[in-house]
């Protein structure tokens, strides 16, 4: 059995490729079922975020397993394999384990140390368990990876400060507005006419960061206006005007800064649409949806600047140097967690031998006990029989304790295999060739 991961991320693919492989929450279950049907895949779990799509699997054979996952990704995205494959990466065994733990810790994120990825890994673990696509190996790996993410955030300063896609989007707005006014740095958003489209978790984070950067009023649009009203209610000190998505064009015309973050699978704002809108201000669009909410052709509008998640790199690079120093400390913690998992995984190799040894000794115990009891005659009470039964079980457990502990203890693969062969030979656990 082998652990592999196949996927793509902001490091390997632009947003126009990533959005074709974004698997929404409501489609995860079906995708897990499709992958699980493959006999080469023993366990599988999917991580889908705005910046990455990664499939972790326990497979019978590495190359066949990776090929099967790539075939699934090709079918799902409807992109030719020759066009998709250059954007895909794969890691195997120890590298796959380390990669997931680094992802969980925020060490592989666009915004180094961002906190949202940890909850996304937790969700990946929950969905795998709910759909019964994961088993003891991946469940343990995912649990250990969550522990790694928590440890990095509690024992280092990597997670401090504004580190999320939403916060980077707000900082990008500050930076671009500042540049318009000849300011090299971040400016207040107090005077901006802000429109937020979408009322999900990312929009909640957007509003939180907008508030911290000086915004005291904004318009919130959502297809379900009740959801927008509920979200606005969580910010009583902000003036939030909630509208239906049907009023999008009107509210775009009244805005100077528009953030979009919806679960739409296709862009709903394109150049043809905005050309019909009478703009009262120069306008900035910042789209953090994946798939994108705003078509790329909007960038051709003379009075609109349009940005997507790939443009956040400009903001991220401003504070990466400080975080890179902390990241080295975090990577050391992650590697420690990897060792813990790998030692546990390696110890499973001993389980069949241990079980066979227990089974053989239990058979001997029962046979010898039965012989002894038959010689004791009818005068031997049931209570006395239970005492002798417990005694013989205790002796077997005492005999097994040291060798079983040794076999399960941390050691190299060669050392463990040598120990297993000795035990198998001494106790005749395998047939002689």
Curated annotation (Swiss-Prot):
MF term (GO), any: NADP binding
Keywords: Chlorophyll biosynthesis, NADP, Oxidoreductase, Porphyrin biosynthesis
Enzyme superclass (EC): oxidoreductase
Positions with a binding annotation for NADP(+): 198-203
Signal peptide as annotated in the record: none
CDD domains: NAD_bind_Glutamyl_tRNA_reduct
Catalyses which reaction(s): (S)-4-amino-5-oxopentanoate + tRNA(Glu) + NADP(+) = L-glutamyl-tRNA(Glu) + NADPH + H(+)
Residue sites binding substrate per the record: 49-52, 109, 114-116, 120
Coiled-coil parts of chain: none
Entry EC number(s): 1.2.1.70
The protein's annotated pathway: Porphyrin-containing compound metabolism; protoporphyrin-IX biosynthesis; 5-aminolevulinate from L-glutamyl-tRNA(Glu): step 1/2; Porphyrin-containing compound metabolism; chlorophyll biosynthesis
Domain of life (superkingdom): Bacteria
SUPFAM superfamilies to which the protein is assigned, alphabetical: Glutamyl tRNA-reductase catalytic, N-terminal domain, Glutamyl tRNA-reductase dimerization domain, NAD(P)-binding Rossmann-fold domains
Site (Important for activity): 99
Domain writeup: Possesses an unusual extended V-shaped dimeric structure with each monomer consisting of three distinct domains arranged along a curved 'spinal' alpha-helix. The N-terminal catalytic domain specifically recognizes the glutamate moiety of the substrate. The second domain is the NADPH-binding domain, and the third C-terminal domain is responsible for dimerization.
Function summary: Catalyzes the NADPH-dependent reduction of glutamyl-tRNA(Glu) to glutamate 1-semialdehyde (GSA).
Similarity annotation: Belongs to the glutamyl-tRNA reductase family.
PANTHER family: GLUTAMYL-TRNA REDUCTASE 1, CHLOROPLASTIC
The protein's assembly and partners: Homodimer.
Official protein name in the record: Glutamyl-tRNA reductase
Species this protein is from: Prochlorococcus marinus subsp. pastoris (strain CCMP1986 / NIES-2087 / MED4)
């Amino acid at each position: 059995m082998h652990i592999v991961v196949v996927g793509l991320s902001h490091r390997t693919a632009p947003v126009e490729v990533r959005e074709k492989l974004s698997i929404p929450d409501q489609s995860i279950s079906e995708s897990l079922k499709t992958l699980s049907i493959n006999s080469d895949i023993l366990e599988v779990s999917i991580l889908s975020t705005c910046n990455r799509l990664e499939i972790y699997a326990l497979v019978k054979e590495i190359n066949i397993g990776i090929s099967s996952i790539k075939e699934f990704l090709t079918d799902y995205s409807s992109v030719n394999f020759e066009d998709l494959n250059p954007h895909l990466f794969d890691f195997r065994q120890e590298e796959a384990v380390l990669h997931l733990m680094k992802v969980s810790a925020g060490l592989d994120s666009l915004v180094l140390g961002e906190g949202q990825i940890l909850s996304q890994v937790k969700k990946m673990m929950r969905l795998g368990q709910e759909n019964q696509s994961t088993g003891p190996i991946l469940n343990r790996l995912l649990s250990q990876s969550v522990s790694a993410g928590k440890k990095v955030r509690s024992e280092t300063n990597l997670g401090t400060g504004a580190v999320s896609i939403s916060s980077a989007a707000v900082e990008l707005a500050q930076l671009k507005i500042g540049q318009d006014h000849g300011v090299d740095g971040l400016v207040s958003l107090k005077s901006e006419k802000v429109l937020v489209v979408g009322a999900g978790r990312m929009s909640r984070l957007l509003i939180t960061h907008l508030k911290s950067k000086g915004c005291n009023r904004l318009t919130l649009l959502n297809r379900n206006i009740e959801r927008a009203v509920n979200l606005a209610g969580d910010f009583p000190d902000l003036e939030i005007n909630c509208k239906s998505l049907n009023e999008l064009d009107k509210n775009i015309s009244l805005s100077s800064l528009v953030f979009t973050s919806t679960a739409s699978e296709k862009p709903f704002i394109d150049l043809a649409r905005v050309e019909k809108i009478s703009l009262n201000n120069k306008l900035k669009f910042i789209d953090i949806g994946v798939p994108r909410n705003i078509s790329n052709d909007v960038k051709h509008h003379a009075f609109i600047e349009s940005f997507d998640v790939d443009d956040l790199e400009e903001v991220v690079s401003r504070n990466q140097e400080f975080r890179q120093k902390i990241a080295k400390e975090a990577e050391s913690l992650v590697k420690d967690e990897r060792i813990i998992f790998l030692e546990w995984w390696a110890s499973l190799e001993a389980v069949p031998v241990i079980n066979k040894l227990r089974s053989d000794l239990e058979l001997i115990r029962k046979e010898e006990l039965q012989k002894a009891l038959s010689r004791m005659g009818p005068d031997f009470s049931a209570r006395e029989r239970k005492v002798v039964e417990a005694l013989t079980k205790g002796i077997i457990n005492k005999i097994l304790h040291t060798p079983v502990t040794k076999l399960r203890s941390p050691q190299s693969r060669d050392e463990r295999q040598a120990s297993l062969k000795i035990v198998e030979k001494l106790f005749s656990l395998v047939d002689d060739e």
